[in-house]
């Protein structure tokens, strides 16, 4: 990254206002904010007039900061009054909202020396993070040929995933590839060099397909395979979607960087959403909320003190027109990874710079992914169909792993239909006893935990929360500490009780009986409740664990299940 030296060091934060830009390594943290580093006292002093607004004069960094609804003595927008429609909801999810995980976890399943072919299906992939995490985590001992199928019903998401793979496979330099991928994926604005790459070798690959289908109907479907030695990418799209993919490599006519930033900020910093932002900020440590506010404002994924002046091109894969930003206001790259892993990642980022740590975390992850691609026999297949129709498109292939995100939630496809339509694509135990379909339930506990249930247990849950968070006497009717306690209660909820009720309500036993499948009582790929609190209140580190979960976007109520066919 522009703000990270090849050796993994942060550049001095003196970005050059009024003096030459410093390019030396930052060695000393600003002691007040611990968000930036300087090479020495001279640069720190020179930069102080600029930095003071992010530092001593930044109210979000003060331990005494309180949300606007409390200081203005009013009801927050998320409480009472008419039910608000979801803000800026365009049904677009370019970034994942659940932490990425290793779908293979070979060490606990087939073994790290596994030699047979491995077939993976991401039936509702969303962004490519789970695939990247999985391939980056494959042990060096495993040299199995792989086929990786990535499907999503949003053609824009499929297109971005294809571009990311092509960026990885057309660039030999791992550092350049990682830099390009991270900014295309997560930054609202990109560098001129990345834009030239998109409109150079990537455009050339896509344009060749578009020329071949010029005379075909708009709904005509065409597949194209690009081969890179032992690696390949096959993309199947309708003609209209191929043309949209080509268009996504170029800035929409008339879209300036200033206009793009205004469009984005009208969502990410919308005045009518201030209470929602402040509710999240109040749960975060000061450095995290300062970093979050800066990312909402600038939209470039870099360490806090890094210069952003080279990121002058609106990301054309996100800005698809001249008047809208595709994501909800709370979309955040951090939501796609384990918050505790980011915070604990060993790197050169300043102690309080959570987005700097994420930058280093992703640099390491994508570099390992790139390394795995270079040394492996991997064939990618990307599709854009409804998940329940996949059996019509994948042919005779069966899969060692299937990941379906949360389409198994009752509000989407549901577990019964998932098992009916997608389950048959899984290998049987005779082919691979470790073959599994991984389902996520994001909403199951909430669906059971209705208002009547809440009234029964709220007092008990609040008392449990207070074992981790010291209660403070309320300062008024809209005291933020009291209001956010309602969010914290999810972290102490008896989720097993409510999920058992959910399984009965959704007839899981009957699903197993009719399908010949079963869910594993002891998961071997991902924990059933991976984000749940592990420590009891009296244990060392419990309060810190509670605070980390509380400051993340997760509740601890997220449930994974691993399904397999019963052995005969």
Feature roles, as predicted:
Residues 2-33:
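Cys/His-rich Zn2+-binding "zinc-finger" mini-domains, especially FYVE domains
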Residues 2-8, 50-121, 125-568:
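Domain-level detector for long C-terminal conserved domains
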Residues 11, 39, 43-44, 61-64:
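Solvent-exposed, well-ordered amphipathic alpha-helical segments
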Residues 21-24, 30, 46, 378, ...:
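Residue-level signal for the start and early helices of compact helical domains
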Residues 30-52:
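Cys/His-coordinated zinc-finger cores
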């Amino acid at each position: 990254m522009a703000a990270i030296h090849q050796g993994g060091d942060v550049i001095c934060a003196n970005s050059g206002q009024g003096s030459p830009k410093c390019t030396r390594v930052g060695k000393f943290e600003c002691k007040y904010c611990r968000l930036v580093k300087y090479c020495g006292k001279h640069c720190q002093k020179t930069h102080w007039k600029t930095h003071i607004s992010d530092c001593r004069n930044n109210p979000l960094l003060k331990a005494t900061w309180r949300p606007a609804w409390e200081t203005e003595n009013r009801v927050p927008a998320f409480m009472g009054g008419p039910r608000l429609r979801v803000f800026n909801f365009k049904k677009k999810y370019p970034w994942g909202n659940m932490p990425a995980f290793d779908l293979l976890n070979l060490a606990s399943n087939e073994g790290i020396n596994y030699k047979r072919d491995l077939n993976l299906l991401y039936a509702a992939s969303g962004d490519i993070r789970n695939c990247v995490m999985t391939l980056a985590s494959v042990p060096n001992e495993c040299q199995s040929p792989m086929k990786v199928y990535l499907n999503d019903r949003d053609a824009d998401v499929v297109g971005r995933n294809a571009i990311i793979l092509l960026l990885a496979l057309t660039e030999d330099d791992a550092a350049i590839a990682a830099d390009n991928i991270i900014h295309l994926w997560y930054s609202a604005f990109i560098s001129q060099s990345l834009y030239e790459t998109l409109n150079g070798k990537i455009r050339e690959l896509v344009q060749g397909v578009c020329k071949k289908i010029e005379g075909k109907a708009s709904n005509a479907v065409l597949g194209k395979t690009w081969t890179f030695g032992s690696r390949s990418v096959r993309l199947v799209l309708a003609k209209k979607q191929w043309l949209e993919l080509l268009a996504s490599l170029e800035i929409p006519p008339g879209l300036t960087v200033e206009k793009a930033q205004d469009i984005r900020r009208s969502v990410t910093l919308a005045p009518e959403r201030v209470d929602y932002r402040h509710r999240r900020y109040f749960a975060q440590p000061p450095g995290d909320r300062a970093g979050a506010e800066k990312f909402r404002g600038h939209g470039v994924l870099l360490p806090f003190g890094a210069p952003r002046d080279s990121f002058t091109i609106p990301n054309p894969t996100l800005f698809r027109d001249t008047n809208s930003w595709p994501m909800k206001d709370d979309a955040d790259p951090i939501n796609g990874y384990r918050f505790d892993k980011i915070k604990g990642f060993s790197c050169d980022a300043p102690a309080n710079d959570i987005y700097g740590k994420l930058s280093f975390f992703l640099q390491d992850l994508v570099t390992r992914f790139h390394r795995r691609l270079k040394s492996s026999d991997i064939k990618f297949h990307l599709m854009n169909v409804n998940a329940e129709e996949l059996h019509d498109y994948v042919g005779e292939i069966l899969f060692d792993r299937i990941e379906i995100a949360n389409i198994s939630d009752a509000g989407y496809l549901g577990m019964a239909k998932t098992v009916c339509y997608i389950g048959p694509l899984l290998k049987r135990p005779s082919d691979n006893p470790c073959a599994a379909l991984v389902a996520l339930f994001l909403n199951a506990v909430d669906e059971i935990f209705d208002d009547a249930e809440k009234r029964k247990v709220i007092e008990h849950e609040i008392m449990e929360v207070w074992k981790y968070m010291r209660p403070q006497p309320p300062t008024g009717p809209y005291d933020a500490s009291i209001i956010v306690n309602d969010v914290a209660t999810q972290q102490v909820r008896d989720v097993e009780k409510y999920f058992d009720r959910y399984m009965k309500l959704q007839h899981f036993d009957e699903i197993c009986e009719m399908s010949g499948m079963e869910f594993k009582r002891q998961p071997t790929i991902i924990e059933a409740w991976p984000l749940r609190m592990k420590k009891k209140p009296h244990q060392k580190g419990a309060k810190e664990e509670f605070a980390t979960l509380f400051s993340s976007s997760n509740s601890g109520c997220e449930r994974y299940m691993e399904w397999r066919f019963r052995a005969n």
